Amino acid sequence: MHAGLVAQALVKSILHMHIEVQMASEFMYSDPVIDEKTLVIAVSQSGETIDTLEAMKYAKNRGAKCLAIINVKGSSIARESDYVLYTNAGPEIAVASTKAYTTQLAVFYLIVARMAHSRGVFDDAQTQSFVRELQRTPEVMKKVLERRRDIH
């Protein structure tokens, strides 16, 4: 959900497009407008989240295409999706899904960069710069973590 909210802000600010982000558990009950031009992006760390799987099936039954952003290969959501982007975050040890969330954000940033380029919002140089900055994320995170004792 939260990675989707970041994606929504990116899409609105860079692409000036309207998208809706919803909890999978509420999706079917919100009377969404869905047709064959609709793309539903399902986000799940495990690829087995029942609410997400059911929301995807609901959308597909109404003509939507479904893209899954998931961590686990061969999962139910992967099998049900039209398209799959694997985050390859590895297993989550902590309750907070930090690795999966970070990789989901990276995938959304790359999707937006590609869309911006294909729609002429970004030229080649802007797209490359956008992706380069994203690639710097681990380096920047390392520097921040090295200063963790200085941060209050």
Feature-to-residue mapping (PLM):
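Glycine- and acidic
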Residues: 37-42, 49-53, 92-97
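Anionic-ligand anchoring segments at beta-strand to alpha-helix junctions in alpha/beta enzyme folds, i.e.
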Residues: 1-42, 48, 60-74
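Short loop/helix-cap segments at secondary-structure boundaries that form the rim of catalytic
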Residues: 75-80
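Active-site phosphate/pyrophosphate-binding segments
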Residues: 83-152
